[in-house]
Amino acid sequence: MMQTKVQNKKRQVAFFILLMLWGEVGSESIQYSVLEETESGTFVANLTKDLGLRVGELASRGARVVFKGNRQHLQFDPQTHDLLLNEKLDREELCGSTEPCVLPFQVLLENPLQFFQASLRVRDINDHAPEFPAREMLLKISEITMPGKIFPLKMAHDLDTGSNGLQRYTISSNPHFHVLTRNRSEGRKFPELVLDKPLDREEQPQLRLTLIALDGGSPPRSGTSEIQIQVLDINDNVPEFAQELYEAQVPENNPLGSLVITVSARDLDAGSFGKVSYALFQVDDVNQPFEINAITGEIRLRKALDFEEIQSYDVDVEATDGGGLSGKCSLVVRVLDVNDNAPELTMSFFISLIPENLPEITVAVFSVSDADSGHNQQVICSIENNLPFLLRPSVENFYTLVTEGALDRESRAEYNITITVTDLGTPRLKTQQSITVQVSDVNDNAPAFTQTSYTLFVRENNSPALHIGSVSATDRDSGINAQVTYSLLPPQDPHLPLSSLVSINADNGHLFALRSLDYEALQSFEFRVGATDRGSPALSSEALVRLLVLDANDNSPFVLYPLQNGSAPCTELVPRAAEPGYLVTKVVAVDGDSGQNAWLSYQLLKATELGLFGVWAHNGEVRTARLLSERDAAKHRLVVLVKDNGEPPRSATATLHVLLVDGFSQPYLPLPEAAPAQAQADSLTVYLVVALASVSSLFLFSVLLFVAVRLCRRSRAASVGRYSVPEGPFPGHLVDVSGTGTLSQSYQYKVCLTGGSETNEFKFLKPIMPNFPPQGTEREMEETPTSRNSFPFS
């Protein structure tokens, strides 16, 4: 609650505290004068000289002349810097009877905002003659009236003021009367007729005089009225009022017909000579707001009163008896001010569009006024509390509306401000004026991407100019400051040919692949994109784009072993005594793709004899499916299909030649089994090693013996033991010697040994027979018994 009161005090400015902030205005008010009715365009003053400004400063700072009510009595010539009359001025219309007639105005300069107080005095010329309300006045005077008796006459009116106004009255030459010029309290002059010599009805029953009103102009102007005087018979008594001066106070909002006051007069005569009737004297039918009842003397309102126009009235009341004699009294009616006028607000300067980020800007300059008086004239100016604006008093009744601090268009782009002017009368009256202030944009926000990094995917073998994705950035500014242009930034990797890989649409951020991408050559790359606005200076930001090339199944499996290059296929030897599951060979293949496109599966596509051999689907091992017999053919041709897991799948085939050999014993290569239990005793490991060494020695001796016997019996055999005879060249870099299970040209087998006591696992040694010449005769082989019987182990 306390905080709200403090804010209200900050926002409200009492009009009656007239703070003269001379830091913003000139230290003195400059005064100019001009005669009324002067032609428009007449030179009044040179502002540059009078204000002490540099030449051209008035025009560059948008000088303006501001009068109350936005009436333009003067105009500013931006070329000559002269102040000229904008129209003919009528002093009587502008100020009435008020003298001097001064019109205050302000010279308003912008950039920065500055006030200069000035005033224009309109001097009167004698353009009006005095004028009586009636061309003829009637007076009835008893012949027994003593000399020195004064008879008030109706006054003349002159719209001019000062020396040009009404100055005196004269009367035509006569022996009975002279005229006096009297002053009223408000300064107006009225005539009084003074009797100098007694009247005689029998001698002259009627007189006609001319009353002349003269002003002080040069030459003087005058007005006349005829006075007709009727001399009456003896009548001892004239009507007399109870008071010579009556006073009344009337609120300005009294209704029409309401009673103002009642005057009364009596006549001591009897009969018709004692009957009194009332009338208003010095009646101005245009401005007179009162009427009187001729019988009762009640004075009532016939027109509405307005304190702001006339604050008091001087009324003369005349009482006339039946004999024509009259008496007069004066009535002063003071009009009481009522708070019947709401404050007025006049906007002199207003900027509807203000830039953001400036600490303090003058938005509007306005003046306030209230036609009431006293307490009813005091006003308070205020705006809403929740706005970043302040009201500051300027000069006299002027106020400036300024920003409280820098505004942010992105937070709020428009403000509706209601200026409230409230007077302190009872009841309080107020005036409101709403203005709309829009905040113009300044380029203070860089574009912001919707994501700090983008990940895009494109499948390889794409068509050139393919739209692969988009980046998007927004700018909180508006207009041209919010227009974003996209670009590719130089890559951090100098070897990345970014300009030949992708491009970006500068207007919408769409990204395009410029050429077909190959996953096998380039799986992914990163680059940066920039977003720049079109403000001045331009602001920018950047984002990281990661492009991932998706693999397409565009590579068929490639068979490494056995070699499928069009040369003569190699032959695998299998002893007829081989057990089911005997490893014949292993098809080794690779796929240049990745992921599931590189997952290979194997299957036996063709075989000379179905059911004799089988292919493991996942590793390509070719094994015997059953026991061999003498009835099985000696030569077999197997076609193994290698297929990837792509969509659609791609495949390749490998052709194998298998030769069944009688009486040739080979070590049984069992299927992979689970490792022995870890809990076996260490002593068992020692026994297994000794047993394995004995069996291996016996097995090696048996093999050598078997090979020697077979070579003797089969002179046409081209090789001894289990080996592959390549009938064509086989590239050395494709031989699998890493223990993957692929059979090379040399015959391979594994000897199972146990490891250390810690593992209780078997290890396998791989004796490898050196390659034999692809062609040879039994005689040549007999000449090299070392080759036949040598089985080096590695």
Curated annotation (Swiss-Prot):
Gene3D superfamilies: Cadherins. One of its GO terms (biological process) is homophilic cell adhesion via plasma membrane adhesion molecules. Glycans are attached at N46, N183, N416, N565. Calcium-dependent cell-adhesion protein involved in cells self-recognition and non-self discrimination. Thereby, it is involved in the establishment and maintenance of specific neuronal connections in the brain. The lineage of its organism: Eukaryota, Metazoa, Chordata, Craniata, Vertebrata. Keywords: Calcium, Cell adhesion, Cell membrane, Disulfide bond, Glycoprotein, Membrane, Metal-binding, Repeat, Signal, Transmembrane, Transmembrane helix. InterPro entries: Cadherin-like_dom, Cadherin-like_sf, Cadherin_C, Cadherin_CS, Cadherin_N, Protocadherin/Cadherin-CA. Residues 1-27 form the signal peptide. The gene is PCDHB6. Residues 773-794 are annotated as: Disordered. The chain crosses the membrane at residues 689-709. It comes from Homo sapiens (Human). Residues 34-132, 137-241, 246-345, 350-449, 454-559, 566-669 form the Cadherin domain. Cadherin 1 to cadherin 4 domains mediate homophilic trans-interaction, the interaction with an identical protocadherin expressed by a neighboring cell. This is a head-to-tail interaction, the cadherin 1 domain interacting with the cadherin 4 domain and the cadherin 2 domain interacting the cadherin 3 domain of the other protocadherin. The cadherin 6 domain mediates promiscuous interactions with protocadherins on the same cell membrane. Each cadherin domain binds three calcium ions. This is Protocadherin beta-6. It is a single-pass type I membrane protein. Residues 784-794 have a biased composition (Polar residues).
